[in-house]
Amino acid sequence: MSNSHPLRPFTAVGEIDHVHILSEHIGALLIGEEYGDVTFVVEKKRFPAHRVILAARCQYFRALLYGGMRESQPEAEIPLEDTTAEAFTMLLKYIYTGRATLTDEKEEVLLDFLSLAHKYGFPELEDSTSEYLCTILNIQNVCMTFDVASLYSLPKLTCMCCMFMDRNAQEVLSSEGFLSLSKTALLNIVLRDSFAAPEKDIFLALLNWCKHNSNENHAEIMQAVRLPLMSLTELLNVVRPSGLLSPDAILDAIKVRSESRDMDLNYRGMLIPEENIATMKYGAQVVKGELKSALLDGDTQNYDLDHGFSRHPIDDDCRSGIEIKLGQPSIINHIRILLWDRDSRSYSYFIEVSMDELDWIRVIDHSQYLCRSWQKLYFPARVCRYIRIVGTHNTVNKIFHIVAFECMFTNKTFTLEKGLIVPMENVATIADCASVIEGVSRSRNALLNGDTKNYDWDSSYTCHQLGSGAIVVQLAQPYMIGSIRLLLWDCDDRSYSYYVEVSTNQQQWTMVADRTKVSCKSWQSVTFERRPASFIRIVGTHNTANEVFHCVHFECPEQQSAQKDSSDEPGTGGASAAGQQLDPHALQAPSGSSLPSSPGSNSRSPNRQHQ
């Protein structure tokens, strides 16, 4: 026996879902004029409809058809002047069925349809139509799409249009759609730093727009041109004959160009958010430095003493360096570099950017700090074409080594103070390349692994002998730090005393917490005036149980959301359970182990000058 019904969506037993049938039956009312009690007239075409359905689906029609106005009269005809018959047909189908087919429609119809969705208050339809328009952007339709998206304040569609135009700026300038842009939309486009076309091309396109829009204020439009970015020849032979800019404006531009630093000019640059542009895909290349090919190959795993890095000799006048040329001027605010880290060495360095290789602006200065492994660097956004990394110090030899380099623009929020990041999240983690460089533990970085529950009498802590040594944590790079948090070993009732110091170079130390005369247990929160720090040293001065200072966990800055009550689970062993089996003094030298005097004593320390 045949079944005339289409396949139905699966529903759980006890649930009936026939929404698709309801949609079909209500949609069938559009085919004829049965039961219709209102008619819309669009482009001389009549559209019979049903008041109750329109009112149920749309607040606008509810007010129009039941608000006591002329349109609420029985059998009323309502003319609509601000749309097309094609777009209104699509809207009625959506109102009656919840469905709309976009793929077969022209861009002009889709934009009219989007306008109706906005006017009549269908936010879900507005979003879905915007998402589809994002997928079909091209040179011919992007300008009119941007105009509509700007008019109706559609952020996602506006953003996608801007990104498309930024990446195709010169083609957009020469398109027919550019001439039909509204003045507001036009200025929103060309005032963007990321609209990276040559300034001469922008000027000529605006000149053409002014000819096609003679009623607009041309002076306001021409103010969007960045005259100092144009050459003297262009100013005299292209701008001056147009007559749209005064001689004084041209002379001022020449003056700014001749008297300003090159990097102070308001350059335009390509903007590709959240994507590394220091790649061959985007035309980047290493133009200075030794072993150039390794730096941008994307391999951050396969490197050792002899290969997998770029380098330059460290000299006193800082003339050497590793220089990257980007494929085109670009806007960046984030750089990541991987310093060679197969041993415990540290480096110092600075980074500069330029547009012409003559005028350099320093964006990162870590020349007075010791740094290791991955460097995650942030700075105010800059347009640049060249990036230079200059090593100033290596704790092992006179060679500066970089394994990988990345740069991009990121929308991630960050705070800088004195040129250093003020971290919001814990940066004393293994993932952030922090390490314990002094202290005794079964596992070198147990202090930083984030485990604050699984510790006992015999493992998962870091310690040092009172009166000798300390526990020292090295962060991968300097940060502005104003708080730290410790978990002292608390499987019994013992208490500790200690103090904390910070440093940027392991030579000069500043005490930030003095708890030598305080009995301290379990979680310790330490806050102090924010200051630069690459190293944190924790020195125990007293333990009521023995002559060893034990710490289970360290973080900086303090993560308040992770605060643990010291009365809850003082360790997996617990004082009572573990105390029945082990002597607390065993913490000085855990049974069955032979702990090194420092975690790094077994690591290689190559001193090969040719590395």
From Swiss-Prot:
SUPFAM superfamilies: Galactose-binding domain-like (SSF49785), POZ domain (SSF54695). GO terms for biological process: adult locomotory behavior; circadian behavior; modulation of chemical synaptic transmission. Residues 142-240 form the BACK domain. Pfam families: BACK, BTB, F5_F8_type_C. Residues 36-104 form the BTB domain. Residues 560-611 are annotated as: Disordered. GO terms for cellular component: cytoplasm. InterPro entries: BACK, BTB/POZ_dom, BTB_POZ_domain_cont_9, BTBD9_BACK-like_dom, FA58C, Galactose-bd-like_sf, SKP1/BTB/POZ_sf. Residues 586-611 have a biased composition (Low complexity). This is BTB/POZ domain-containing protein 9. It comes from Bos taurus (Bovine). The lineage of its organism: Eukaryota, Metazoa, Chordata, Craniata, Vertebrata. The gene is BTBD9.
